[in-house]
Amino acid sequence: MDAAELRAMQAPIKERYKADPSAAVITLKAKGSIETEGLTCKVETGRALAVAGLHPASGGSGLELCSGDMLLEALVACAGVTLKAVATALDIPLRSGIVAAEGELDFRGTLGVAKDAPVGFRRIRLRFDIDTDAPQDRLDQLLKLTERYCVVYQTIKSGPPVDVQMARV
């Protein structure tokens, strides 16, 4: 896909959102079932069933997916797609690229071993290794706009309010 095709594809969507801003507000959903056997949650992905369990550092077997890894994978996926879309829109040719994310967790926090240990990632690092002949100023612009428009990156960075409820069934 080139910049003209991307613009043509997105133009009617952008026009609709400009004309009716409420049409741009979409509710994304995820759902999982808590299993009676084992310490797992089966997440419906729309493509397959993903079974998440405890990370080995908190007693898990390592056979199930780890939610922390899934968070990083969502960041990599979103950042990669966003980078490619922005590069396409800016006519920055990319021959290939790798997107990688990593972060440290102190498992004492989630295991309740130390009250001063935070629960969650201390820091996340996101890296793009791309094969291109584009000049550095264009790559700087590409990175800036990728950060600006990546939904998962902005969500992690901004930390929106999260409402939690529990209901008896």
Name each model-derived stretch:
Residues 1-73, 83-169:
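Extended beta-strand/beta-hairpin segments
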